[in-house]
UniProtKB/Swiss-Prot annotation:
Lineage: Viruses, Varidnaviria, Bamfordvirae, Nucleocytoviricota, Pokkesviricetes
Keywords: Early protein, Metal-binding, Zinc
Natural source organism: African swine fever virus (strain Badajoz 1971 Vero-adapted)
Protein name (record): Protein A151R
Motif Thioredoxin WCTKC motif location, chain numbering: 131-135
Quaternary state and interactors: Monomer. Homodimer. Interacts with protein B119L. Interacts with membrane protein E248R.
Residues given in the record as Zn(2+) binding sites: H102, C109, C132, C135
Induction: Expressed in the early phase of the viral replicative cycle.
Cofactor needs: Zn(2+)
Amino acid sequence: MMALLHKEKLIECIENEVLSGGTVLLLVKNIVVSEISYIDNSYKYFTFNANHDLKSKEDLKGATSNNIAKMIYNWIIKNPQNNKIWSGEPRTQIYFENDLYHTNYNHECIKDFWDVSTSVGPCIFNDRSIWCTKCTSFYPFTNIMSPNIFQ
């Protein structure tokens, strides 16, 4: 029961970032592999190769911020812990493992250093976590990584 409540809280936090940020970047080994952006009144989903060449573009017609948040949540759960999410315009709102990311207009990721991360919020944590800007709290993903998470 607690895992389910925690999952719902995480989805709520991610949805808040989707609504307030406008762009979400999904990173694997610090390389952007996907982007979800709100453009022209709908969500667009882009995928990229390692050189950041566009592989595909999809219009997510009819998708809501909650649908997008659930999609991002599922991506987090299914991917290794060294993957990261960037959200913002152009400030970082979600970050993992003390790594904080901004992007320039070419969507090249620029790693920021300690002085920047300390200005965003608490930056020392061991578990992969989401920092929710709405309720200004950390929500660790480790609470929901157990095999019986979906029971």
